[in-house]
Structure formats: C-alpha cells, structure tokens
Amino acid sequence: MAGNTIGQLFRVTTFGESHGLALGCIVDGVPPGIPLTEADLQHDLDRRRPGTSRYTTQRREPDQVKILSGVFEGVTTGTSIGLLIENTDQRSQDYSAIKDVFRPGHADYTYEQKYGLRDYRGGGRSSARETAMRVAAGAIAKKYLAEKFGIEIRGCLTQMGDIPLEIKDWSQVEQNPFFCPDPDKIDALDELMRALKKEGDSIGAKVTVVASGVPAGLGEPVFDRLDADIAHALMSINAVKGVEIGDGFDVVALRGSQNRDEITKDGFQSNHAGGILGGISSGQQIIAHMALKPTSSITVPGRTINRFGEEVEMITKGRHDPCVGIRAVPIAEAMLAIVLMDHLLRQRAQNADVKTDIPRW
C-alpha cells in the first residue's frame, strides 16, 4: 500500500489498523534542539481520543503515546522520531458478522476491489483510528510553529446538520464537548445528538481551522501551492467530502469588486482569499473549512451485497460516532500544522536570504 506519507521536508508516515496491536508513525525533518516530551503530544491526543463524552464512540482507548526515537535528554536530535500508540480496547467480535458484507458508505467494497482482501475489523487501515498518529505528529508541528514563529492554529465546529455555528468566542471551544464556538447553540446541538442516538442515525458537520501569525511567502507554485497542499491534507481525513479555502464556493455569487482583498497602507481590508494569493501565504490568517459526511455506521437498516453478490440487509453494530465532525477538529488542526511546518522548512531552505521592502502586517 502506497500513500502513507505526507510532506517533503517535514515528512509524516503512519502505519497500523483499527484493531491491530498498535498504531505508529515516523516523523522526519524535525530540526534538532527542540524540547519535546510525550506530554507535549498528549494534550491534543486527549482532545481527539474516543470515549471522552456521550456524544462520541464509546470505544475507550487511552491513546498514550510513546516516543521511541529521535529525542534525547528531552530535546529532538534531528533524526527520525518514532511514535507508537497501543490499541487496548478492540472488540473484533463486533465485526465478525460483516466479514463477508460490504457496509454501504464505507471503504469495504473499494478496499476489496483494490487489494482482493480487507481487514473487516473496524475498517482496518481505512478507519479514522489511524488519525491518532496524525494528531501526535501534528502536535510536534504545532509546538515548533508556535515557539519558533508565533503561529497559532485553532479549529472549531462551525455547522452540524442544519445548525450553523458562528465563531463568537474561541475560549468556548474547549469548554464543551462539541468544540463549538457559539455558546448559544450548545442546547440545540445536545438536542440533535440525543435525537440521532434515539433514531440510530448520524449527521454531517463542517469544521473550520484557522492559522494566525503565518508569514507571507509560504507555498511553492505551481503544483505545490499552499492552498493545494492544505486541501490535499484536509481531504485525506476520513469522511471529508469537501474543502474550502477562505470564502470558498461563496465567491461564485460575488463580483470581482467585492471579492478582491484591497490593500491600503494599513494592510489588507478583507480576507476573502483565506490568507493565500497565487498559492502563497499573504501574511493574513489562513482560513480553511471542511465538510464531513454523516457516518454510515448506523443502526438504521440499509441495503447492500455480500462478497458473493447476494443482496442483504445491513445493520451496523459496534461503537460509533453519531457525528464524526466533533472529533475531527484536532485532526484538522494537526493536518494544517503539518502542511505549514513543511512549507516553512521549504521556504527557509530556498529563500532564507530573501529580503524585501514591501510592508508586512
């Protein structure tokens, strides 16, 4: 299986399956001398891990990360950093009934078509369980970006089903189980989740991620544009079906006179572009949104076929999230951090000596 690595100078390679012994990743390109401990990674892993609220899957994994290499006496050595998380709460028997059945809306059918076989236990490699390692690697990038460049990366839920969520107060995001920045909508979200659990159904969501303090100049035209790499990274997250940068698809209804981000001596007067122009960061906030589909792991019966071509009824058992968008927030932050760190290292490698007299805000 190819496609397990992202990045060029800052490279992250993950391995492992949902019900395997462990998940792991190798992180290459981390500069030496950066203070790093397992505790630095654990905070974001705790934000993502399952079983932390009644609104997410009740699979209870501690997700305790171990640093296997690349750190000596509390600082990075510049060599490959090996990370490992053991799986401890697998219930593979929950999936024995579907070993020959293709769950609709999942990767069962496509994995078997591609490889001729599949790990049916929780989806195997296609499970979002894999994203725990992305979050661990992303925590390294977030620490580096914050300490060396003052870059802050934050994410939140901005829509669940037909409930839009305004970014009113970032401080509220960590104070509720929905990563919701709008305290006035918590009761509505709670009511929706209760209804979904009662119905045995699920719902989609929109997640927004914002990077502040990003310097101008990141991005490698033409095929490695910063927005292209961000879209690639976010689209690689399980259940993501759409990505927008800045105003995204809303620009279709705008005139050029409305959409252009005019510049005065005081700086940009708007940010419809989401902080990226011509594939290169402008120094404004980088803003990206991603749409996540409702999970197909529901108890509402549905039609499918088995590997023998017979039509069967499918009712998913096991422990699943009614809205996968909730736990996707720290994953989106991690993927944005990975892309930004990679591009910062690339910019430093090629253009460290470039100086301009153009104003920066």
Swiss-Prot record:
Its cofactor is FMNH2. It comes from the Bacteria. GO terms for biological process: amino acid biosynthetic process; aromatic amino acid family biosynthetic process; chorismate biosynthetic process. Coiled coil: none annotated. Keywords: Amino-acid biosynthesis, Aromatic amino acid biosynthesis, FAD, Flavoprotein, FMN, Lyase, NADP. FMN binds at residues 125-127, 238-239, 278, 293-297, 319. NADP(+) binds at residues 48, 54. GO terms for cellular component: cytosol. Pathway: Metabolic intermediate biosynthesis; chorismate biosynthesis; chorismate from D-erythrose 4-phosphate and phosphoenolpyruvate: step 7/7. SUPFAM superfamilies: Chorismate synthase, AroC (SSF103263). It holds the Pfam family Chorismate_synt. Reduced FMN (FMNH(2)). InterPro entries: Chorismate_synth, Chorismate_synth_AroC_sf, Chorismate_synthase_CS. GO terms for molecular function: chorismate synthase activity; FMN binding. It catalyses: 5-O-(1-carboxyvinyl)-3-phosphoshikimate = chorismate + phosphate. Its EC number is 4.2.3.5. This reaction introduces a second double bond into the aromatic ring system. Belongs to the chorismate synthase family. Homotetramer. PANTHER family: CHORISMATE SYNTHASE. This is Chorismate synthase. It comes from Escherichia coli O6:H1 (strain CFT073 / ATCC 700928 / UPEC).
